[in-house]
Amino acid sequence: MRNLKLFERFKSTQVHAFTTQDSPSTSSNGSPRMMKFLGHPKSKSRSLLPHGFPTTDLLEPPLDSYLKPIDLVESLSNLYRRIESSSESEASMLYLEQYAVLRSLGDAKLLRRCLLNARRHAIDVPCKVVFSAWLRFFRREHELVGVESMDCNGLASECPKTSLTHGCDLNVDDEGCECSTVCEDEFGSDDVKISKADEFSGLDEVSDISFCVGSEKAKCVRSRIAALSRPFEAMLYGSFVESTTSEIDFSENGISIEAMLALNIYSRIKRVDLFRVETVFELLQLASKFCCDDLKSECEARLAASVTDLDKALTFVEYALEERTTLLLSACLQVFLRELPQSLHNPKVMRFFCSSEAKEQLAFLGSECVFLLYYFLSQVGMEEKLTTDTMLILLERTREFARTNWQKALSLHQMGCVLFERKDYKAAQFHFRLASSLGHVYSLAGVSRTEYKQGKRYSAYRLMNFLISNHKPHGWMYQERSLYNVGVEKLKDLATATELDPTLSFPYKYRAVMKFEQKQIKEAFQEIDRLIQFKLSPECLELRAWLYLATGDRESCLRDLRAVLSLEPNYVVFGGKMRDDLVEALTAQCIEVESEADCWVRLFDRWSAVDDVASLAVVHQMLQNDPSKNFLRFRQSLLLLRLNCQGAAMRCLRMAWNLATSEAERLVYEGWLLYDMGYVEETLTKAEEAISIQRSFEAFFLKAYALADKNLDADEISCVVQVLEEALKCPSDGLRKGQALNNLGSIYINLGMLDQAETAYKNAIEIKHIRARQGLARVYFLKNQRKEACEEMTKLIEKSCSKAAAYEKRSEYCEREKAKEDLDMATTLDPLRTYPYRYRAAVLMDDQRETEAVEELSKAIAFRPELQTLHLRAAFHEATGNLSLATQDCEAALCLDPNHTETLHLYSRSKDQASSIDNTIFGLD
């Protein structure tokens, strides 16, 4: 049902920003001088320099703070083999390693799956607690208003109660969490009086021994107390004097009479949930002293369940460390971790994690658990862009508890990155060198950068030269060397970097600024536009906004600034904090105040022209004019998804959820958030709940979207048609109805109802849903009207601002040479699209140019190792008899998707052939 998808979700990659932190011209907030500048429309670009305009001397790419294997395919292949052959106790940390390796791809769903698998295979409670909190943080649930950190959201993998049980939970996320069906407070109130325990059976047994605390007595049953542990049994039935007396003085044991009374009750009914927390603490001490294992476990569980907020966690954690009670400590850690990122800024929490005492006391959990704990904390800190002393301590703890090479290399490299941001270049260089000595070659880029920052430009250049000469070249190597090169050689390095890895932002930005400085204004815009049309980021839009402002085009500048704020509302730009009054000042100078109707007309126009950046800007303006129009935030999220800005899209959805004015509206947004995580059944449930409250277009649309994602037969697919028809009966605007009609056409195609599909697409086109031309072209093609199909796609190309997908699709309806031209154009416009590489490789393979076919696929794999491309290259290797490389590509592909049926078959076949050849050779020997 892929045809029903509205949005193409590409795997996002690391954004490379230009940094101006070393620039003396950067102002603190940018507003006073900027306001002055706004009064001069004809100002030249040079007058912008004091305001922080990026010059070529100031531009440099940031150092990536994650693992970057020198051969990612080989690393993935190796990981897959180790995961497949791992024991139950090894699997969890291998999935964590997979997460660390795949961070460079930036695929949120893939990374979440790694964490989920790690959580499923985790055995120890502390590890389960960390993974559970990590999964929760990954979804940014802390941004949802009204959701408490210790709430269960219905997902078993993130449930705070489920995490506190020992052992693997391999099916933890296949079904919803059942904890909501259990009584919320299964332990009762702390204020329950012990006297009420008389209501329980078993308490009427006659007492035959008393434990005295001062003048008070706790009457007990000798046999029941003896059954609690061997020490008690020896004391009460052994050769000790206590075995022959009916009263035992316990005054010197530091135990209160209330605790002894509680011990009596526990010995009879085996429950501790009746007692106050203070009493349970005493029972736990007594259990530790007299080796009452069952009592100790019960007390730990009771205390762990009572740790429900930060204050209690801070109170209990010291005791948990002193008594080395794993469960209670895990419960305290869980509260700290589920409060992230806020707890990173809590002095008491950070004092605990950063203290040398805690480091020593936490060690009893095992180095694996403690490494995981500090790794998670440090990753949250990296995402929060912390460069404080606390951040360095967290990374240092991560390094201290690291045991494998990848763990040590990653923590050292990240310490280098933080120290580099702090401008402590000598210390940063030391850590980068250590990381590189452990096999992390990318850390040498950090070494060369710190050399450069310390005035050793030639030394930095030589190091990168050595790297390029001794390893398979990567785009980042040439990008890094370009910083230390000059003139024509610098531009050659940048060109090579773009050729090897077109996703790198820095080369485009450098060339754009350079051309602008050389007064090649048109070429400067073309250069930055090349990047923006396939990889949208705040940094790139910011640069283009500067160019527009410098050339006096304030309207285009304002459009890009609004898009920047849509992507990142708190983005720092123009040498200081982006402020609303700057946008307002530009608005006042660009256009007259638009009415709501004018904005809708403009949004309709830009949406229809597939001008997503301009559409984002209009939606931002409409929200600024009237923030109460919450449905616009949902539209914003759709646009951001289409632009492959998944993080920003999910933030918009969370904001819409927070500001929803009705339960039905909130359920729809919650459904989309669940859908994005892959929870189709839960999404359907939310859609049904929303429909039961209020029949709305968005609720029916969500239901249809989720249904179409399931494996349905023909009868079930027809249900999707009915749901979409119900959606179209509900009030909505033309933009959304156009999308519904477009989806309806896709369903009709799947059902073989081509005439109905044609009607649906034409109706969508009538209300200016231009993307429906792609569906209409498909209908014509299926009706053997290839010429008409090609013409429809040509119309889409002519009318659309974003053309790469249209060129790619038109290639399916053209003759071979024309198809190749279209696919070449698609690659030029959007090098992230992998289908053109696969098509060209298949053509080369058909022409028996096997080496060139493999090289074509290798180009794409070098910067985007995607499943289908790896599978195809594996098939080519198999066809040419290179079975070892075929196996390696299959393993790398299966590391991305272990259930991909075709790759599994190819992998099995390649291994069988290789084994057969080995056996033949062995027989000849």
From Swiss-Prot:
Keywords: Coiled coil, Ethylene signaling pathway, Repeat, TPR repeat, Ubl conjugation pathway. It comes from the Eukaryota. Residues 207-307 form the BTB domain. The keyword Repeat applies. Constitutively expressed in green and etiolated seedlings. CDD domains: BTB_POZ_ETO1-like. Transmembrane segments: none annotated. Residues 509-533 form a coiled coil. TPR repeats lie at residues 409-442, 538-571, 664-697, 738-771, 773-803, 834-867, 869-900. SUPFAM superfamilies: POZ domain, TPR-like. The keyword NADP does not apply. GO terms for biological process: ethylene-activated signaling pathway; negative regulation of ethylene-activated signaling pathway; protein ubiquitination. Pathway: Protein modification; protein ubiquitination. Interacts with the C-terminal domain of ACS5. The BTB/POZ-like domain may mediate the interaction with some component of ubiquitin ligase complexes. Belongs to the ETO1 family. This is ETO1-like protein 2. It comes from Arabidopsis thaliana (Mouse-ear cress). The lineage of its organism: Eukaryota, Viridiplantae, Streptophyta, Embryophyta, Tracheophyta.
